[in-house]
């Protein structure tokens, strides 16, 4: 069958859809936000494809995979196994990096293990293999009379029971072994947990160093090397043991390293991970700036968290410490600001006096007392308290004053020094993964390997080159493999998974993607489209939910869903090529494609007001000492290719520095020399795409504050007054009015052993969240549950005569959210929808005209018609005297800006510079600006 046939799709707002989608083609599903695109692509096609695949597996396998609900659809024919690549960011696990997520790091570990050259971490000398004579000579250098054990490590950090190993070595005549550090008799019944990792070392011999033991020692070392894969451990009684390898050792200092294995290069394995930070690269430590936020205060008032309670004036224990230390070093502290105290003295206060003892003097009701002891230091004391506390609350409290600080042992490299001393060419594995992806590929291609190394590495190099190229093809050449996966944007993480899927080479699969072009500059769009076509050409069906016009024109077929959002959507308006859609009179998308409808370029752009916010000398991440002005009272767009430093400049430097100053916060901020012009604004609001709440209880009504007003209305009804119901009766968060069977959730979770957990409507309240008595109170014939079930559009009409409520809900409708329900769980809202709920909440507030609004890619998830509405709203905010600053790639929005700040020229280390600033027309004339080159077509210059 060469097509997927869907009959009677009714999931969410889909109106009994019947549609045929060609297989093994690139198909774009487009339409307004909330029109039903995701309902068709993800909740119908993907859900059913995944469900059928999982149902075919055993019940044992199903419990790990989880099964999806059967979508509301009569039938789907011709379905393939489905893989979804959505906007959800990759793992927040600090151990996940771009390298591990893409599996490129696995190939690099293999490369370093097979053709890496080890160097001594102490001397920097190339390490060669050790002969038996060299090993014996080194052992014989021990002092006469030293007791030693010779051991052969046969199992190192591997899971299993190993009963056969114990039996074999006992048969060979060995008597004892050391298992996980404990000496055991091989004749004993040794029980090991097969799920845990173990180390087993066979005890070969026990010796005392004398002149005449050389022959016996040589024989024992030979035996150990034979049974333990060229390794031998010499355990010196009363001292440290030493590992020798017949493979590699430093001729100068005697440092030896075992045979290189891929596990040694993994920071997730004890064999390679830095023991100090366990391979994470950083440690959570007390931050001096957070503990001493106010350097203008005195020592008594300025240090938080120290002493018997939170530090405050008159805290006698802390005062005694400080005064005694000050007396010891001859420093005056009374009435002196912290910033004026000697730094050497503050070092002693913060980090301790080491072995130096202080005469502590303190007074009590029984007289004056002396105690001589070193001072531990504020930071070591608080870190010890943090380690020792058993209270989750206290731990959380201490962590408010802690930050992630680079590990002092590995300096963020995550690996042991001996592993970092292994090089391929001139670089170790950390230095290589710190390079941008494009540079890594160039470096690997330029390597000069010997004939033998070439034979060993050729296949590994092919795989590496192929996978690196896939990442370059999807516009991610600026990323480094060492970048933490949790710091990637939704678009970046989706494109990484897309590149990984191409690398897997699967065929006959249905891929469903959610706006892969998000966060991608127009310059890189063609590479992404080529990648999607490559995935299709492998023999897969590629279905993309997308608003990008270039992708539509590149697709084999476009499906336009609409005509409106929510209840007004769910129909197929047009289906065919982009050229055919452009001719359709039913399709809003077609009207924009053909130019019959468009977002107009402003006839006149706002003039500069003479008021600016200025960042001076920003150097965070890849920013190259950037100094830039942002004109206030304007609509500003910050543009540039992916990875050029836009988010770093705006979110890390500008927003965090302003927020810290205006709110006296202890927030860690992006590095810059200074920030000027703050007196021109009274507040800064960052309207991002994070969820409006983390639990199903949070919803648009609670977030916007309209739910409080609605509960006030219900509390003033005659029925509520007669029953004595207060406002709290109409809350589903507290006992009283809520249904106690489901605690006001409206749903009950049922745990299934071999299936995913099932959520069913509460049988008592039928999903309405409230008890029967509360639901009897009606306003205009509707209960509180009925109101929460209304769409925004319905609620605007319902509360037409209550301006306070109507105005708040009206702003939700204005930002294109007329289709969402007032009580819709926040967990079901997309990032773009959550951002617009926040935007609507801000719009409904009284404007001061001195606010800076920051939005990071507000067009995410928006159809061009929704972008049209968004532009109108943002312009309204600026008309009231405010400043709107957006980070954006969408040229339809960029062309309406008053002022553009363009970063570049490239991404990553080649970015971080200001390429051009000014009105859009000026940017188009800048030859180095990629944004300007593409903007010309939109401004018809």
Residue ranges and their predicted role:
Residues 1-941:
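Conserved phosphate-binding elements of NTP-dependent enzyme cores
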